[in-house]
Amino acid sequence: MTHAEIAEAKTDTAVRQAEYDNQRAIVFQQIQEGLIRANAARRLVDLYRNTLRPQAEATLKATAAAYQADRTDFLNLLDSQNMSLDVDISYFRALAEYQSRMAELERAVGAPLAAPEVKQ
């Protein structure tokens, strides 16, 4: 091998190493961002499951009991029902968002992840 060929091989190796390092940094950034988004989506699912849905259900039950006791009108009962349904819809949207974020994270990692189970 001549000096020119050796120099060219070293340059080619350095270029390939830089490309590898750049791609690795991009993937690492995608993983970090994916993890942040997945964790945020998971926290939202937990908020709906542990707080908002039970509150909406309790409000609906209380309003239904008040309606049966003739202490509130039918419109309030319908409003409580709509609120409960809206919370349920938002919960399932948040759950779908979480699952989508986990799928994105798996694509970035390149392997299936053992995500914590999210109960419906």
Region roles according to the model:
Residues 4-90, 97-108:
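Amphipathic alpha-helical coiled-coil segments
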Residues 106-120:
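Terminal intrinsically disordered/low-complexity segments used for targeting and assembly
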